[in-house]
């Protein structure tokens, strides 16, 4: 699918070099705010004030979805106005069957125009393929997360003493050596 002038990893590396920082600024507006219409100005202020230091911005789509259609409109209106040299990682943590993932990938990379997305690989690596068809885009796979519940699955020990998150890390390059266009990273 469409080419781009600078890949996600190149854009991120340039930004880290320019700022001397690996700061990723989360954009997580609370849906319970009394004045929904104050959220766009608040987000723009956060972006403006942190842009000189930010290596990336990371809006969490769940917060926008929780506000309904208006929340998605806020996100869709914000993204084109963000600094073009600062990569945007959409924190979506999606993991679904391929056909559904195809539409998530389209929505995030084509409609919203984000540079990268977070995904859950636990339904199998074939569920990632729709995202991997976008040249130069980034994909962050959840491998071992910081929440206490990560012990329930991600940190479980497998036969042979390895942990689930290690399996995720090992399988990514092996599974996708034929796909060199996007960048796959682990979180």
Label each PLM-derived region with a short phrase.
Residues 3-77, 83-84:
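Conserved N-terminal beta1-alpha1 strand-loop-helix module at the mouth
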Residues 76-96:
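Catalytic PLP-binding core of fold-type I/II PLP enzymes
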Residues 42-46, 74-78, 104, 108, ...:
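A general structural detector for well-ordered alpha-helical segments in enzyme core domains, enriched
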Residues 98-110, 116-176:
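Conserved anion-binding
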Residues 177-183:
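Conserved small/polar residues in nucleotide/adenosyl-binding loops
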Residues 23-27, 57-59, 88-90, 118-119, ...:
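Hydrophobic faces of well-ordered beta-strands that scaffold small-molecule active sites
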Residues 28-32, 62-64, 93-97, 122, ...:
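Active-site beta-loop-alpha junctions enriched in small/polar residues
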């Amino acid at each position: 699918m469409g080419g781009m002038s600078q890949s996600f990893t190149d854009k991120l590396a340039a930004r880290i070099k320019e700022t001397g920082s690996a700061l990723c600024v989360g954009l997580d507006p609370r849906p319970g705010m009394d004045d929904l219409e104050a959220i766009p100005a608040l987000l723009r202020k956060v972006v403006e004030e942190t842009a000189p230091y930010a290596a990336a911005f990371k809006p969490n789509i769940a917060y926008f979805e929780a506000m309904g259609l208006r929340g998605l409109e806020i996100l869709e209106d914000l993204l084109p106005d963000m600094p073009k040299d600062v990569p945007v990682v959409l924190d979506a943590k999606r993991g679904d069957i391929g056909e559904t993932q195809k539409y998530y990938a389209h929505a995030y990379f084509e409609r919203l125009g984000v540079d990268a997305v977070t995904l859950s690989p636990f339904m199998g690596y074939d569920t990632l393929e729709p995202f991997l068809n976008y040249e130069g885009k980034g994909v962050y796979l959840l491998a071992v997360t910081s929440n206490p519940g990560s012990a329930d699955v991600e940190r479980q020990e497998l036969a042979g003493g390895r942990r689930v998150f290690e399996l995720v890390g090992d399988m990514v390059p092996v599974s996708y050596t034929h796909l060199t266009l996007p960048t796959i990273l682990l979180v």
